[in-house]
C-alpha cells in the first residue's frame, strides 16, 4: 500500500515541498533563513490577530487601546512585544536571506529572485504601516514624513499624497486604511511565499559551490528539517530574551508620547531595520533625488543578474569579490548607524560617502572585480 503522504492529494503537495524534496547535500546554515522567515511569519500573524481583537483604529483611542492591551489584557504585553520585536527578527532574517542570495549567486534563478524582491517590498510596506498604528509621536511623524515623499513625484505628487492620506494631513482616515492594509498584507505575503517556493522548486536549491548538484541530492526530511529546527530554536531564544528582558531596546521612546500634530520630535526616524534606506534618502539634498535614491537602493536588486560578469556563480572561490561583499555589509551597517543620528556634521558627510559607496560597489566594483577574477583564472 502506498504511503498516505505520497497518495493523498493535499499531503502529496506537502510531501514534495517539505519531506521528500531533493536537496543539495552541501547547503550550509545560511540556507536556514528561508524556512526561518516562513516560521517567523506564523507568530506575526497569530499575535497580530490577537492584537487586532483589542485595538481600535481611531485617532482618539488608538494610543490608549495599545496601553489597554499592555495593562489590562491577559498577557497583552507579551503579545504586543512579541509582535513588535518579532518584526525586527523577521527583518534581520530577511536581510541575511537576501545577503546569502547575493553571496552565493542565487539571483541567477531570476523568477525566484524577482518574486523575493516583490515579497521584500510587501514586507517593508506592511512593517511601515504597522509602525503607524500605535499612534505615538514617532508613528504620526514617521507616517507624515514618509508618505510626504510621494509629493516629490512631478505633477501628480500632491494629489497622490492627499489621496493616500484621505484628507489634507495624516488623520483618522489614514490610520483606518493603514490598519486595513496592515491586516490584509500578511495574508497576501503568505500567498506570495507559496509562489516564491513554487518557482524555487522548479529549479531546485542553489548550493555554496554554485555548481549543479543534481547528481548529489538528499531528502529534505529528516536532514534539513532538523537543521532548520535548530536555527528556529536559536532565533526563538534570542526573540524571547529580547521580549522578556529588553522589549523596548529596538523601539523609540518618542512612541510612548501620544501623537501631537503641533509638536515635532527633535529627530524623526523610522524603525531600526529601515535606517539604512533612510540614511540614503537623507544624504541627497534634493527631495526628488533622495526619493529616487531610496527606491533605487532596493530596486537595484532586480538588476543583480544583469551585473553578474563572473564565470563562477558563487563567491565561494572568489576572494576579491568576498572582500567587496563584506565591505558592502559594513557599509550598510554604517548607513544604519547614520540613519539614527541627527542631521549635522560629520554624520551628513559620512552618510553621503556611504551612500555613494553602496551604489558604487553594486553597480561598478562588483562587475569589474568579477571580470578581473575571470582574467586571473584565464577564463
Swiss-Prot record:
Belongs to the cytochrome b family. The lineage of its organism: Eukaryota, Metazoa, Chordata, Craniata, Vertebrata. Binds 2 heme b groups non-covalently. GO terms for cellular component: mitochondrial inner membrane; respiratory chain complex III. A ubiquinone binds at residue 201. Component of the ubiquinol-cytochrome c reductase complex (complex III or cytochrome b-c1 complex) that is part of the mitochondrial respiratory chain. The b-c1 complex mediates electron transfer from ubiquinol to cytochrome c. Contributes to the generation of a proton gradient across the mitochondrial membrane that is then used for ATP synthesis. Heme b b562 binds at residues 83, 182. The cytochrome bc1 complex contains 11 subunits: 3 respiratory subunits (MT-CYB, CYC1 and UQCRFS1), 2 core proteins (UQCRC1 and UQCRC2) and 6 low-molecular weight proteins (UQCRH/QCR6, UQCRB/QCR7, UQCRQ/QCR8, UQCR10/QCR9, UQCR11/QCR10 and a cleavage product of UQCRFS1). This cytochrome bc1 complex then forms a dimer. This is Cytochrome b. The chain crosses the membrane at residues 33-53, 77-98, 113-133, 178-198, 226-246, 288-308, 320-340, 347-367.
Amino acid at each position: 500500500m502506498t504511503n498516505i503522504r505520497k497518495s493523498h492529494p493535499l499531503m502529496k503537495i506537502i510531501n514534495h515541498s517539505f519531506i521528500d524534496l531533493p536537496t543539495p547535500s552541501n547547503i550550509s546554515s545560511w540556507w536556514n533563513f528561508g524556512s526561518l522567515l516562513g516560521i517567523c511569519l506564523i507568530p506575526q500573524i497569530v499575535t497580530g490577530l490577537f492584537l487586532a481583537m483589542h485595538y481600535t483604529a481611531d485617532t482618539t483611542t488608538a494610543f490608549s487601546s495599545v496601553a489597554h492591551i499592555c495593562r489590562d489584557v491577559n498577557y497583552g504585553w507579551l503579545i504586543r512585544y512579541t509582535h513588535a520585536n518579532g518584526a525586527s527578527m523577521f527583518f534581520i532574517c530577511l536581510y541575511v536571506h537576501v545577503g546569502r542570495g547575493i553571496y552565493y549567486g542565487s539571483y541567477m534563478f531570476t523568477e525566484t529572485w524577482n518574486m523575493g524582491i516583490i515579497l521584500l517590498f510587501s514586507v517593508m510596506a506592511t512593517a511601515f504601516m504597522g509602525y503607524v498604528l500605535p499612534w505615538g509621536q514617532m508613528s504620526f511623524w514617521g507616517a507624515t514624513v514618509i508618505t510626504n515623499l510621494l509629493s516629490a513625484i512631478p505633477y501628480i505628487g500632491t494629489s497622490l499624497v492627499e489621496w493616500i492620506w484621505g484628507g489634507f494631513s495624516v488623520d483618522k482616515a489614514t490610520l483606518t486604511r493603514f490598519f486595513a492594509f496592515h491586516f490584509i498584507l500578511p495574508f497576501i505575503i503568505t500567498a506570495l511565499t507559496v509562489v516564491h517556493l513554487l518557482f524555487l522548486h522548479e529549479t531546485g536549491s542553489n548550493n555554496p559551490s554554485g555548481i549543479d548538484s543534481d547528481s548529489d541530492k538528499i531528502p529534505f526530511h529528516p536532514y534539513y528539517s532538523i537543521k532548520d529546527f535548530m536555527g528556529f530554536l536559536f532565533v526563538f531564544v534570542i526573540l524571547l530574551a529580547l521580549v522578556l528582558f529588553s522589549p523596548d531596546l529596538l523601539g523609540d521612546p518618542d512612541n510612548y508620547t501620544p501623537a501631537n500634530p503641533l509638536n515635532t520630535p527633535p529627530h524623526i526616524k523610522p524603525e531600526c531595520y529601515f535606517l539604512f534606506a533612510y540614511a540614503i534618502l537623507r544624504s541627497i539634498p534634493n527631495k526628488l533625488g533622495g526619493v529616487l535614491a531610496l527606491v533605487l537602493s532596493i530596486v537595484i536588486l532586480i538588476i543583480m543578474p544583469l551585473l553578474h560578469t563572473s564565470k563562477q556563480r558563487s563567491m565561494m572561490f572568489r576572494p576579491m569579490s568576498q572582500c567587496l561583499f563584506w565591505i558592502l555589509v559594513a557599509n550598510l551597517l554604517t548607513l544604519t548607524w547614520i540613519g539614527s543620528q541627527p542631521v549635522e556634521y560629520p554624520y551628513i558627510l559620512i552618510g553621503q560617502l556611504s551612500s555613494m559607496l553602496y551604489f558604487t560597489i553594486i553597480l561598478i566594483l562588483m562587475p569589474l572585480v568579477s571580470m578581473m577574477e575571470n582574467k586571473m583564472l584565464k577564463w
